[in-house]
Amino acid sequence: MNKLKLHGFNNLTKSLGFCIYDICYAQTFADRDGYIAYIDDEYNADRLTEILRETCSIIGANILNIARQDYNPQGASVTILISEEAIDPRDVDTSEHPGPLPDSIVAHLDKSHICVHTYPESHPTEGLCTFRADIEVSTCGIISPLNALNYLIHQLESDIVTIDYRVRGFTRDVNGVKHYIDHQINSIQNFMCKDIQSLYHMMDVNVYQENIFHTKMMLKDFDLKHYLFNSHPEQLSVQEKDLITKRLYKEMQEIYYGRNVVEV
């Protein structure tokens, strides 16, 4: 696609959203609580902030503000407000006066921001534990959130990933013609490196006429030892290993396809 000469600012909004799932099996209630405590500490607000800072660097965005919070009993959130151009310190108002109303903050946040929220949870009786990180990178202008795709997948090593990318609005060229997208894309997969593609089964559901792209990913290889928390396959009987494997596989299939599997 040839470069466009625009009339004014690039008004397209590009949003990249991830749901990243980590799944494990904990044999006892104590192990389940231990997994949730471990994952909650592993992905606390401080670490998530560093991941998002690096994401900003990768996509070439400038950080305006960071808000972060760890929650009790578990979970964390980080939101970073970003801009396309560096901020001149002379433009920062440090005078003593009331700040902006919430409506104006939300309006700005909808333009360019990066946010992540975490959701640890567990099955009440079957030992299944899942951790979900929900990430959104939303930009306006020439910044592309797709540049951070490989970095985020590598940083948050996951069993299942669902990715949404959409382009909204339009921008106008110097001749007054509206353009609803400013780059070529037919699949999110085309922006992934080969090593990621080799690790995952992937499926696309795209709505090209609406500039909406969706990719689901699930790890190809299954090794039970990677899914056991605080235990090892050698400690389990053949029957126990088969039961746990079936439970994990069913859980992963349900999350991947977004529907519950009814056993007949």
Swiss-Prot record:
Protein name from the UniProt record: S-adenosylmethionine decarboxylase proenzyme
GO molecular function, one term: adenosylmethionine decarboxylase activity
Cellular compartments per GO CC: cytosol
Family assignment from sequence similarity: Belongs to the prokaryotic AdoMetDC family. Type 2 subfamily.
Cofactor binding note: Binds 1 pyruvoyl group covalently per subunit.
Transmembrane segments: none
Keywords per UniProt: Autocatalytic cleavage, Decarboxylase, Lyase, Polyamine biosynthesis, Pyruvate, S-adenosyl-L-methionine, Schiff base, Spermidine biosynthesis, Zymogen
Record PTM text: Is synthesized initially as an inactive proenzyme. Formation of the active enzyme involves a self-maturation process in which the active site pyruvoyl group is generated from an internal serine residue via an autocatalytic post-translational modification. Two non-identical subunits are generated from the proenzyme in this reaction, and the pyruvate is formed at the N-terminus of the alpha chain, which is derived from the carboxyl end of the proenzyme.
UniProt cross-references to Pfam families, sorted A to Z: AdoMet_dc
E.C. number: 4.1.1.50
UniProt GO BP: spermidine biosynthetic process
Modified residues annotated as Pyruvic acid (Ser) in this record: S112
Reactions mediated catalytically: S-adenosyl-L-methionine + H(+) = S-adenosyl 3-(methylsulfanyl)propylamine + CO2
Assembly, per entry: Heterooctamer of four alpha and four beta chains arranged as a tetramer of alpha/beta heterodimers.
Organism: Hamiltonella defensa subsp. Acyrthosiphon pisum (strain 5AT)
Active-site residue list: S112, H117, C140
Recorded metabolic or biological pathway in which this protein acts: Amine and polyamine biosynthesis; S-adenosylmethioninamine biosynthesis; S-adenosylmethioninamine from S-adenosyl-L-methionine: step 1/1
Residue stretches in coiled coil: none
Free-text function comment from the UniProt entry: Catalyzes the decarboxylation of S-adenosylmethionine to S-adenosylmethioninamine (dcAdoMet), the propylamine donor required for the synthesis of the polyamines spermine and spermidine from the diamine putrescine.
Site (Cleavage (non-hydrolytic)): K111, S112
The protein's required cofactors: pyruvate
